């Protein structure tokens, strides 16, 4: 059964980053959880990262996705919501419709076709002299995950302003043209030509304001199984996981990236101080292969760690040896650095040539060590991002 509820009080939100809002009463991305991820990344415990991310994803999977339906008054937003839910206007839990303004405040509807989704019917824009900016502020548009901009008869300046604001806020949005049945019944053009004309008009209006192209659907609320309605439902079903987890993945990656960068800066200080032996137990600072293996282990990219990640994620893509990658290149280049190192510290070397060789040796050694470190850190970020993306459930 479809359900409708009156607009509840909006929960307080704690702003954590540009990517995601965190409910104050929730623990999905609490400070403690973030610290656990930072510690795991810093210590190279990639398997622990997988475990923590799984916990977070499981918690988020129970969260509702908030979809706001908005547009000018009279565009048929309530009728569109009923058609999207595949219920008639006369049914008990349908959104009220009529020629007068029927939606006075944000109202939430549910549908068995879209579990874990809240469809919010917002009051139409344009019934008063209220600006788009004040309207969006009053509707608290920032709390919604997806905005559906509904238009009919004309794609007005208000619709364009809505799209501009959504792009500026980095909000995902769809454009839906309703009342297509009326257009088809009154137009003298063939149907394909009329559809192209409507699409071109919307696209041109948005392109003039440098709004990137977003999904666009032409529908008739009286034919919820025809025109672009099936395509709209299919697109929405595919987008729901992305909508639900995109901000979360972005935020988690920012945490991981920041932690990796901090670890890199710390190791570079050890390189400058010629202290890799103490910190990593490296016996030969001129041995590029030994250094690379030590750095890979530090970031959890050694074969054993990646094998454990593959088992934990049940994904064979992580079960490939990284220790064997680029080995041949380092074996070819390593003798040059090693020879410089040995020559620079040879007891028999004296005077200016000795000092010059020592400087050259130290400079070359530090440069190669930092190059290896940067390559390993970049690979660590790739692996962490892959873990986050592959952790997202798909329908």
From Swiss-Prot:
UniProt-listed SUPFAM superfamilies: P-loop containing nucleoside triphosphate hydrolases
Residues where GTP binds: 72-79, 97-101, 179-181
A biological process from GO: innate immune response
PTM note: Ubiquitinated; polyubiquitinated in the cytosol, promoting Gbp1 recruitment to the T.gondii parasitophorous vacuole membranes.
Listed transmembrane segments: none
Gene3D superfamilies documented for this protein: P-loop containing nucleotide triphosphate hydrolases
Subcellular location, record wording: Cytoplasmic vesicle membrane; Golgi apparatus membrane; Cytoplasm, Cytosol
Effect ascribed to mutating residue 92 to A: Abolished polyubiquitination
Coiled-coil segments on the chain, per record: none
InterPro entries listed in its UniProt record: G_IRG_dom, Immunity-related_GTPase-like, IRG, P-loop_NTPase
IRG-type G domain location: 63-239
Summary of the knockout phenotype: Mice are highly susceptible to T.gondii infection, due to impaired ability to mediate clearance of acute protozoan infections. They also display strongly increased activation of the Casp11-dependent inflammatory responses when exposed to extracellular lipopolysaccharide (LPS), bacterial outer membrane vesicles or Gram-negative bacteria. Mice lacking Irgm1, Irgm2 and Igtp/Irgm3 (panIrgm mice) show resistance against M.tuberculosis one month post-infection; then, panIrgm mice display higher bacterial burden and altered cytokine during late stage of infection, leading to increased mortality.
Record-level Gene Ontology MF annotations: GTP binding; GTPase activity
Keywords linked to the UniProt accession: Cytoplasm, Cytoplasmic vesicle, Golgi apparatus, GTP-binding, Hydrolase, Immunity, Innate immunity, Membrane, Nucleotide-binding, Ubl conjugation
GO cellular component: cytoplasmic vesicle membrane; cytosol; Golgi membrane; vacuolar membrane
PROSITE patterns attached to this UniProt entry: G_IRG
Phenotype when changing residue 358 to A: Abolished localization to parasitophorous vacuole membranes or Golgi apparatus
Main localisation: membrane
Reactions mediated catalytically: GTP + H2O = GDP + phosphate + H(+)
Similarity annotation: Belongs to the TRAFAC class dynamin-like GTPase superfamily. IRG family.
Function field: Immunity-related GTPase that plays important roles in innate immunity and inflammatory response. Acts as a dynamin-like protein that binds to intracellular membranes and promotes remodeling and trafficking of those membranes. Required for clearance of acute protozoan and bacterial infections. Acts by participating to Tgtp1/Irgb6 and Gbp1-mediated parasite killing by promoting their accumulation on the T.gondii parasitophorous vacuole membranes. Also required for prolonged loading of ubiquitin and p62/Sqstm1 to parasitophorous vacuole membranes.
Protein name listed in UniProt: Immunity-related GTPase family M protein 2
Naturally occurring in which organism (per UniProt): Mus musculus
């Amino acid at each position: 059964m479809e359900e409708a509820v009156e607009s509840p009080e909006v929960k307080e939100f704690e702003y954590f980053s540009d990517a995601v809002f965190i409910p104050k009463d929730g623990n999905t991305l609490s400070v403690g959880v973030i610290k656990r991820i930072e510690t795991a990344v810093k210590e190279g415990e990639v398997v622990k990262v997988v475990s923590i991310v799984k916990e977070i994803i499981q918690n988020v999977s129970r969260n509702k996705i908030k979809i706001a339906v908005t547009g000018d008054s009279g565009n048929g937003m309530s009728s569109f919501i009923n058609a999207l839910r595949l219920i008639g206007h006369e049914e008990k839990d349908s959104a009220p419709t009529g020629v007068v303004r029927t939606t006075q405040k944000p109202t939430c509807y549910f549908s068995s076709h879209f579990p874990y989704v809240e469809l919010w019917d917002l009051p139409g824009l344009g019934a008063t002299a209220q600006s788009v900016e004040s309207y969006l502020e009053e509707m608290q548009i920032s709390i919604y995950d997806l905005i559906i901009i509904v238009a009919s008869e004309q794609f007005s300046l208000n619709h364009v302003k809505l799209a501009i604001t959504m792009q500026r806020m980095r909000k995902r949005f769809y454009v839906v043209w309703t009342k297509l049945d009326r257009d088809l019944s009154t137009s003298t053009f063939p149907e394909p030509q009329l559809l192209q004309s409507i699409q071109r008009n919307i696209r041109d209006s948005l392109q003039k304001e440098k709004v990137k192209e977003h999904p666009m659907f032409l529908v008739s609320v009286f034919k919820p199984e025809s025109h672009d309605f099936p395509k709209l439902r299919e697109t929405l079903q595919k987008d729901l996981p992305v909508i639900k987890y995109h901000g979360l993945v972005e935020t988690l990656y920012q945490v991981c990236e920041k932690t990796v960068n901090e670890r890199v800066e710390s190791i570079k200080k050890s390189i400058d101080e010629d202290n890799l032996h103490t910190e990593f137990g490296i016996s030969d600072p001129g041995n590029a292969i030994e250094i690379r293996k030590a750095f890979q282990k530090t970031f959890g990219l050694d074969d054993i760690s990646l094998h454990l990640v593959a088992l934990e994620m049940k994904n064979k893509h992580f079960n490939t040896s990284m220790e064997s990658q680029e080995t041949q290149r380092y074996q070819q280049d390593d003798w040059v650095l090693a020879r410089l190192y040995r020559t620079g510290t040879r007891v028999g070397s004296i005077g200016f040539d000795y000092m010059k060789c020592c400087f050259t040796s130290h400079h070359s050694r530090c440069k190669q060590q930092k190059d290896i470190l940067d390559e390993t850190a970049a690979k660590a970020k790739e692996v962490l991002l892959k873990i986050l993306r592959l952790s997202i459930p798909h329908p």
